[in-house]
């Protein structure tokens, strides 16, 4: 009874635990270079809160919010004092500050609170979401064909999304997604479905339909949320072993389609899966024996033109595999096998940088991974070998030196002939191939108001790369970010990053031949530098109004040329009262070239995201309005517009707009029942 009274008191005193925290605050980054898949995976986690009385170490650490010491404190408290009565009880865990709990709040729930305190909530619920979006100006792809340009998009410029899900956190999840991109002919161009059953005796997890799989450090299967290198320099270094999760994203690649089963007996787990899914791919003309090959996989998901439609489902992929692991409360060791077969051989173009790329119809991966947690640190790693003989390895450690200092260290090596189609381990390259690197990150918190984070990453590429006509190139990247929180409702941050790589640089050279002046193109691999700066200020002016201000800038330079520059400034405001909420932005940007494009996170309708690259010169505006029609029905409307200065068109190719501005609208309604 005393515990319940304490929780009620905490709920009255600390109501801002459930205060709105921006995506940018949680992600801890300016979102530059963050992939669409990363955001989609993060949104899936946010839309399915975890029960703090049922969550295990791997799942909670997978949120990348709590440090090693904080994770230990959480589980020690739960072990010593029993189940949490409410999420407010988390304030009694000594290591968990209010700022940490604000970041954690969107991802957690407490069934004990529902059962004990009698909250009017349902564990099982269904929701249906419908979304429409469109660019208001006409793109060339939707105009009438001309004699010189006859290729056009197949259908209307409206993009549709229909999504349904029923979820009971204890045992069952059913859902489907139907999507059509702008210009596509079929309103069911992409469909996805899943059925998940959990916690039925030794059957821990069964998924039928579409799913992702994350084991070890993501060398073989890395289908989970991870930012890699970011302003969160410690926690994103390590990947948790999450097993299989239903796939509910609108991205049309990077998932399995079939059956996954996960069994648990005491501290042992066994997992098996099979997948049979069609992939988009570029088909080549039949060879002399009539064999049809594909040159590359297509991941855009667009099927708007004749050529894009021809690439749709051109390659059939069959995958199967399994694994076994042993897990204690804070440690895990496991092995995994994965076999992949294609119905057509993959044959890359004959380029030097493609010499070690995958070719053929099958790939086999064998993987060993481990994670061991001490009282102050975690050591982790994975070693994976493909049947080509290539291998990948990730070895790392993260830990809390004391209450003020956290540190991470990671080494990775991916040989040029290592092949993993679902890998997403920590790396500089977008794929885990042809790279060796070592990363060191640090976080220092001298007081509750101040925090600074930094990392240094050195990387080396033993073989040629695309647009790098030389083997054995190298580079480094370093970042420093300062956070200052003068009060509970305001925050100031500044971030500086420097990246150095070796890349191709081309220029024109004049020469004499037969008494005539001619020009030729000279290409040389040379160091390339890019500096970026981001600053952020947020403040809650009243209980209903908050503001955010951002300034970003960059400089880009090859060794032989003068630097080019770009910058952007934006002002946001958000108002909410009762059932209404409104967010607006005005931004100005000016960049000398595309290399200096400025990335800035934008608020969107729920379960959607936007982080466009501002480049050129102009103004950017948007507004997002939401209204709770009743407790079960919510409506969103988003409008955005970019006005460019000193240019007559926007975009290129079939996406070109013949006026210097672009406007987009998006409407969404969600019904919870």
Language-model-derived ranges and their functions:
Residues 4-13:
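Sec-dependent N-terminal signal peptides
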Residues 17-19:
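Boundary at the C-terminal end of the N-terminal hydrophobic targeting segment
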Residues 183, 187-242, 248-280, 401, ...:
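Outer membrane beta-barrel
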Residues 29-43, 72, 81-83, 88-124, ...:
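Alpha-helical interaction/regulatory segments in DNA maintenance proteins
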Residues 153-157, 254-256, 310-348, 355-673:
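Exposed, low-structure sequence patches enriched in small/polar residues
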Residues 217, 221-250, 278-310, 359-363, ...:
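A subset of solvent-exposed loop/turn segments in beta-rich extracellular surface proteins, enriched
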Residues 118-148, 166, 170-176, 206, ...:
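Transmembrane beta-strand segments of Gram-negative outer membrane beta-barrel proteins
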Residues 37-85, 104-107, 178-180:
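Amphipathic, charged-and-aliphatic alpha-helical interface segments
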């Amino acid at each position: 009874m005393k515990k319940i009274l304490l929780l009620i008191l905490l709920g009255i005193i600390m109501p801002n635990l459930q205060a709105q925290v921006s995506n940018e605050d949680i992600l801890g980054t300016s979102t530059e270079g963050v992939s669409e898949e990363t955001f989609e995976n993060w949104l899936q986690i946010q839309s399915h809160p975890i029960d703090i009385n049922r969550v295990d170490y791997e799942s909670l650490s997978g949120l990348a919010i709590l440090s090693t010491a904080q994770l230990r404190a959480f589980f020690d408290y739960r072990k010593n004092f029993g189940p949490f009565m409410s999420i407010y009880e988390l304030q009694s865990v000594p290591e968990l500050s209010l700022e940490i709990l604000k970041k954690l709040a969107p991802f957690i729930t407490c069934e004990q609170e529902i059962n004990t305190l009698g909250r009017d909530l349902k564990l099982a619920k269904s929701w249906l979401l419908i979304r429409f979006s469109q660019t208001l100006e006409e793109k060339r792809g939707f105009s009438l064909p001309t004699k010189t340009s006859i290729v056009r998009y197949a259908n209307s410029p409206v993009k549709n999304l229909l999504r349904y899900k029923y979820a009971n956190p204890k045992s069952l999840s059913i859902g489907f997604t139907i999507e059509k991109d702008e210009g596509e002919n079929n309103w069911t161009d992409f469909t996805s479905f899943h059925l998940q059953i959990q916690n039925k005796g030794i059957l821990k997890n069964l998924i039928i339909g579409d799913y992702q799989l994350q084991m070890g450090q993501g060398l073989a299967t890395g289908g989970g949320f991870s930012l890699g290198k970011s302003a969160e320099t410690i926690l994103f270094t390590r990947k948790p072993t999450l097993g299989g999760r239903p796939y509910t994203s609108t991205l049309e690649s990077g998932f399995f389609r079939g059956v996954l089963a996960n069994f648990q007996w005491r501290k042992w787990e066994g997992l098996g899966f099979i997948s049979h899914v069609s992939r988009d791919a570029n088909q080549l003309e039949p060879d002399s024996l009539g064999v049809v090959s594909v040159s590359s996989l297509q991941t855009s998901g667009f099927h708007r033109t004749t050529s894009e439609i021809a690439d749709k489902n051109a390659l059939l992929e069959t995958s199967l595999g399994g694994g076994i692991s042993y897990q204690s409360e804070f440690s895990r060791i496991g092995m995994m096998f994965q076999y992949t077969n294609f119905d057509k051989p993959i044959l890359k173009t004959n380029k030097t940088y493609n010499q070690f790329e995958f070719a053929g119809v099958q790939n086999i991966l064998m993987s060993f991974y481990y994670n061991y947690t001490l009282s102050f640190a975690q050591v982790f790693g994975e070693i994976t070998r493909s049947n080509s003989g290539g291998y990948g390895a990730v070895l790392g450690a993260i830990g809390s030196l004391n209450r003020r200092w956290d540190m991470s260290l990671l080494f990775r090596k991916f040989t040029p002939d290592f092949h993993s189609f679902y890998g997403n381990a920590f790396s500089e390259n977008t794929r885990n191939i042809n790279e060796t690197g070592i990363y060191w990150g640090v976080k220092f918190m001298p007081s509750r108001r101040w925090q600074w984070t930094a990392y240094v990453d050195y990387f080396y590429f033993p073989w040629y790369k695309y647009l790098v006509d030389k083997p054995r190139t190298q580079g480094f990247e370093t970042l420093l970010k300062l956070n200052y929180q003068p009060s509970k409702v305001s925050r100031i941050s500044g971030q500086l990053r420097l990246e150095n790589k070796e890349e191709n640089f081309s220029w024109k050279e004049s020469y004499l031949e037969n008494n005539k002046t001619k020009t030729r193109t000279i290409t040389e691999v040379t160091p390339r530098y890019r500096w970026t700066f981001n600053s952020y200020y947020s403040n809650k002016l009243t209980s209903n109004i908050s503001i955010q201000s951002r300034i970003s800038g960059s400089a880009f330079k090859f060794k032989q040329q003068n630097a080019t520059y770009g910058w952007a400034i934006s002002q946001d405001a958000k108002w909410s009262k009762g059932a209404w909420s409104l967010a607006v932005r005005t931004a100005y940007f000016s960049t000398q070239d595309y290399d200096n494009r400025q990335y800035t996170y934008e608020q969107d309708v729920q379960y959607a995201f936007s982080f466009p690259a501002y480049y050129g010169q102009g103004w950017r505006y948007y507004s997002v309005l939401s209204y709770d029609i009743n407790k079960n029905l919510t409506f969103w409307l988003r409008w955005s517009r970019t006005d460019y200065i000193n240019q007559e068109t926007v975009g290129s190719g079939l996406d070109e707009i013949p006026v210097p501005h672009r406007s987009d609208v998006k409407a969404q309604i969600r019904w919870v029942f």
